[in-house]
């Protein structure tokens, strides 16, 4: 009896085991990744020592019971409340504990003296800002016990301390629960924790509650002028760019400062997010860039990242977050800060710097990523570079050496079409091995599905670009289902037409080459630009290399080619009157590929008669019977060729389907090991990156970013995630692919026709009202995605009957109409010109200089906007710092003025360079603008109230500029 290919082996390389095992592995990894992404670890049932979660949540509710931007009276109330809470926490610390440990000394600073002038974006923006920061210094056990900060030139004698920073201002349209209320209450709990006996820090700890972050990171910049800024060398910045979920490690300076974060109970994040910030994929910034870039500290940026639709809106409130999210940030902050303040080494202390920045030493570039939200892998980029170079050299050499060994062992079937029969003459064509079959499949398997996925990205961008805003998993399902189905279909067509036992090894070889090239690119970027986001390529190539090597080692189980050729009967021909046959059955025939494709000259009657006959084991295999017609006029040959010419010898059938007979010797279970080496590592590392990118970018199109980039990124990530299936997908049964075809059909239709926004995933519209105080004319502006912004604007009652004009040229279109006049003054002021007062005095001896005195009623934020840039400016009584240049070679076109006092008068000296006309120097012109940002009371900004009341439930309102209302007056000098 003939030996049958085992179809009951649960690990055999047959359809059902392959389908079930690969599907289960993918599900077993994808489901936990989704859980980690969307389920926040529960807060502990009882408060950990030194912390009080109930108190922290109550503080968050108080902090977020109103909008509190810097330019609002509610902001002053928050400032007073925070000072009160700081003193309450300090006073509540026990005098001593049972182990006789004393609480550390604590000093509180209400900074109402510091100010600073600096330049802003594009260097054509100047900013003057006055501090209302709150600083708390917890003296470390090894700190200098003198009050060195009392001396204007005093310097701490101890090692560098640690700064924990959060900002307590919100935007004018958001309550600031995650941006940055959770950071603020976490700072309060850190204050409680480190003033609890037994938790005293070794290094000094500075807790900074800064004010003015939302208006260009002003609070962090002016912090640089406080004496305490000379103490910290490292920092932890707590931020929020979403509205709940897990707090992610956004960025870090180096390996050494990142390692303490690994102590967090639930670390979360990837170094790729830092690379994304560097590439400008996310437009907003945090205080990290000031602390790390301008001041020279080394630290981390821990922030909430999703959903961005709630960011800077009225849904950034306590109701839309949770105690669990608060605990996730707080636990990470405690673990990281404790690791930094207890560090006894000198790794964060360096030599004094000539540029005036903090002497924090230098660290090594870091690679870091979490594993299932429970462990953080962190190591030096240099280590990754060394490992990458080693793998790039060693892996090809190992495969080359194995190939040479196979050649010497006469078992190198790869890339071999024939084998010579020992002792044959030179004219003998040899025995066909069909070892080249399957080599060219991979480009088609990769390019066709990827091309279709990219095409889908363009299609969705063209038809319904914002669908990912609310339906990201519908987009992912569409991409993955299309990719897998097409890959399966192409592989099945190829396997049907030209069966090959080498499909797996050839696809793995192609994957190895492709990933080797990717690793070369990633390694170059690591070395030249310090970008570590390609770390996953190293691990992917490592797994693919081992899987490929196993396939090469499997070939040692095959018979020697010479022995195999000796056993094979002389070559014969098969033909079909239906067309050429590209793929044959088992390779014992000795037929080469050209002979496979010859036509059959037999008549139809003989063929029909042969098909009707019942074949037996003794039936001749050279009679043309057993053929069956397939699509595309190909004929599948079912007979096996025997050793010798006799018909009574048993045939070798220990092969799969119509694959080559010599493959009977290949191991049947090693595919499982290969799959486990190549696929899980990709899912574990690339899967979180895909979810992180989706969460961070899926709702950025409303901010003016290109949605096409996100769809293309998903298409590319789909390819990375599913490519490990390609070596095995030709063995899949039809059940999953056909199901995925249905999924693709449904999700494609949905993604093209569904409305992209919902009450839980709202479209942000950005509001601003401008008032010409000279004429009293005002216009309300809404900016947002087209055409939705126009539809909302024209539906408002005040816009009825008006010609709503829209500027569609910008990345984020802006529509305007004559709005309802604002009532931003505390008392009725009929003449709008009185809202802003200014005086300009031109210098008599210097005709290109003038002094501006500017003030606004019921505001502490104004601007000077010039028609042409001025050469220089200086604000009276301002501090200047060489670390923050305030002048630009291109000049300054706008000067922003912020004060801690209401109705403050700023004095600004301006100098300009304008060519003389008729011997007389020309002056300058522009506008004096003041801002009003307090939208807490109804009726103060009726146009904003109207937008909130009458806009659809799927829209949200955010600020377009620093102010909600901007009133301006014209000037000429």
From Swiss-Prot:
* Residues of this chain annotated as glycosylated in UniProt: 52, 115, 803, 839
Q: What class of enzyme is it?
A: hydrolase
Composition-biased stretches (Acidic residues): 593-607
Q: Which parts pass through the membrane?
A: 16-36, 384-404, 439-459, 470-490, 505-525, 530-550, 675-695, 709-729, 736-756
Name of the molecule in the record:
Vacuolar membrane protease
Which superkingdom does the taxonomy of this entry point to? Answer: Eukaryota
UniProtKB keywords: Glycoprotein, Hydrolase, Membrane, Metal-binding, Metalloprotease, Protease, Transmembrane, Transmembrane helix, Vacuole, Zinc
Indicate the residues that form the catalytic site: 213 (proton acceptor)
């Amino acid at each position: 009896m003939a030996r049958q290919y085992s179809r009951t082996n649960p690990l055999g390389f047959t359809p059902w085991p392959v389908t079930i095992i690969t599907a289960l592995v993918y599900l077993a990894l994808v489901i936990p990744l989704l859980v980690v992404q969307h389920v926040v670890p529960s807060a502990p049932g009882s408060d950990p020592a030194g912390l009080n979660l109930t108190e922290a949540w109550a503080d968050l509710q108080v902090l977020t019971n109103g909008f509190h931007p810097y330019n609002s009276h509610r902001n002053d109330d928050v400032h007073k409340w925070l000072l009160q809470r700081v003193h309450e926490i300090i006073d509540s610390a026990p005098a001593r504990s049972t182990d006789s440990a004393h609480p550390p000394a604590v000093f509180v600073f209400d900074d109402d003296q510091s100010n600073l002038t600096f330049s802003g974006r594009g260097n054509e923006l100047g900013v003057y800002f006055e501090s209302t920061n709150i600083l708390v210094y917890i003296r470390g056990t090894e700190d200098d016990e003198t009050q060195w900060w009392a001396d204007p030139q005093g310097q701490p004698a101890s090692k560098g301390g640690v700064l924990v920073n959060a900002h307590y201002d919100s935007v004018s349209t958001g309550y600031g629960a995650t941006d940055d209320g959770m950071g603020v209450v976490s700072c309060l709990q850190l204050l409680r924790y480190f003033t609890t006996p037994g938790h005293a820090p070794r290094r000094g700890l500075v807790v900074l509650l800064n004010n003015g972050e939302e208006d260009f990171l002003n609070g962090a910049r002016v912090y640089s002028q406080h004496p305490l800024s000379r103490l910290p060398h490292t920092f932890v910045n707590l931020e929020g760019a979403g509205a709940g979920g897990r707090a992610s490690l956004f960025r870090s300076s180096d390996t050494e400062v990142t390692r303490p974060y690994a102590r967090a109970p639930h670390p979360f994040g990837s170094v790729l997010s830092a690379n994304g910030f560097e590439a400008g994929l996310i437009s907003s910034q945090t205080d990290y860039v000031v602390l790390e870039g301008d001041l020279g500290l080394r630290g981390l940026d821990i922030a909430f990242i999703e959903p961005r639709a709630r960011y800077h809106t009225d849904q950034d409130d306590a109701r839309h977050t949770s105690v669990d999210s608060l605990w996730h940030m707080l636990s990470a902050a405690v673990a990281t800060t404790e690791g930094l303040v207890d560090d006894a080494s000198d790794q964060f202390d360096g030599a004094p710097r000539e540029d005036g920045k903090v002497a924090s030493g230098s660290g090594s570039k870091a690679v870091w990523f979490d594993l299932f939200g429970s462990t953080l892998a962190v190591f030096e980029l240099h280590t990754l570079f060394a490992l990458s170079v080693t793998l790039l050299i060693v892996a090809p050499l190992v495969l080359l050496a194995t190939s040479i060994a196979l050649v010497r062992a006469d078992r190198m079937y790869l890339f071999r079409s024939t084998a010579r029969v020992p002792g044959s003459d030179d004219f003998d064509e040899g025995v066909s091995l069909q070892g080249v079959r399957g080599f060219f499949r991979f480009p088609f398997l990769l390019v066709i599905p990827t091309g279709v996925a990219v095409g889908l990205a363009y299609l969705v961008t063209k038809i319904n670009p914002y669908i990912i805003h609310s339906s990201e998993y519908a987009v992912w399902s569409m991409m993955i289902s299309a990719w897998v189905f097409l890959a399966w279909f192409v592989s099945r067509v190829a396997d049907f037409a030209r069966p090959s036992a080498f499909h797996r090894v050839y696809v793995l070889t192609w994957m190895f080459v492709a990933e080797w090239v990717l690793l070369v690119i990633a390694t170059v970027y690591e070395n030249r630009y310090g970008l570590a986001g390609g770390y996953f390529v190293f691990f992917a190539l490592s797994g693919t290399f081992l899987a490929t090597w196993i396939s090469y080692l499997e070939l040692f189980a095959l018979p020697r080619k010479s022995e195999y050729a000796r056993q094979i009967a002389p070559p014969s021909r098969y033909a079909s009157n239906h067309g050429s046959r590209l793929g044959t059955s088992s390779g014992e025939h000795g037929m080469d590929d050209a002979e496979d494709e010859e036509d059959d000259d037999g008549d139809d009657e003989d063929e029909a008669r042969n098909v009707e006959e019942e074949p037996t084991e003794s039936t001749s295999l050279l009679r043309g019977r057993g053929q069956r017609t397939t699509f595309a006029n190909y004929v599948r040959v079912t007979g096996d060729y025997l050793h010798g010419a006799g018909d009574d010898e048993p045939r070798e059938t220990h092969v799969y389907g119509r694959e080559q007979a010599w493959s009977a010797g290949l191991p049947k279970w090693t595919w499982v090991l290969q799959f486990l080496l190549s696929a899980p590592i990709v899912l574990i590392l690339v899967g979180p990156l895909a979810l992180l990118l989706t969460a961070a970018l899926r709702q950025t199109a409303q901010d003016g970013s290109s949605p096409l980039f996100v769809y293309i990124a998903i298409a590319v990530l789909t390819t990375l995630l599913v490519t490990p299936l390609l070596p095995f997908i030709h063995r899949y049964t039809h059940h999953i692919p056909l199901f995925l075809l249905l999924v693709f059909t449904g999700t494609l239709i949905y993604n093209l026709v569904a409305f992209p926004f919902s009450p839980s995933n709202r479209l942000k519209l950005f509001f601003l009202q401008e008032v010409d105080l000279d004429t009293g004319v005002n216009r309300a502006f809404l900016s947002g995605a087209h055409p939705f912004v126009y539809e909302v604007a024209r539906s408002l009652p005040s816009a009825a009957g008006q010609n709503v004009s829209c500027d569609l040229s910008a990345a984020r279109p802006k529509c305007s109409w004559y709005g309802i006049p604002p009532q931003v003054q505390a008392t009725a002021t009929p003449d709008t010109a009185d809202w802003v007062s200014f005086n300009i005095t031109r210098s008599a001896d210097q005709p290109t200089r003038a002094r501006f005195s500017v003030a606004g009623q019921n505001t502490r934020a104004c601007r000077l906007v010039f028609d042409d840039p001025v050469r220089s400016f200086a604000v009276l009584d301002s501090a200047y710092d060489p670390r923050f240049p305030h002048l630009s070679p291109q000049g300054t076109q706008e000067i922003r003025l912020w004060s801690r006092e209401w109705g403050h008068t700023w004095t600004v000296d301006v100098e300009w360079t304008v060519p003389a006309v008729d011997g007389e120097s020309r002056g300058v012109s522009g506008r004096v603008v003041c801002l009003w940002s307090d939208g807490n009371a109804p009726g103060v900004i009726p146009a904003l109230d109207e937008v909130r009341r009458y806009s659809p439930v799927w829209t949200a309102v955010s600020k377009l500029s620093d102010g909600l209302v901007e009133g301006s007056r014209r000037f000429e000098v």
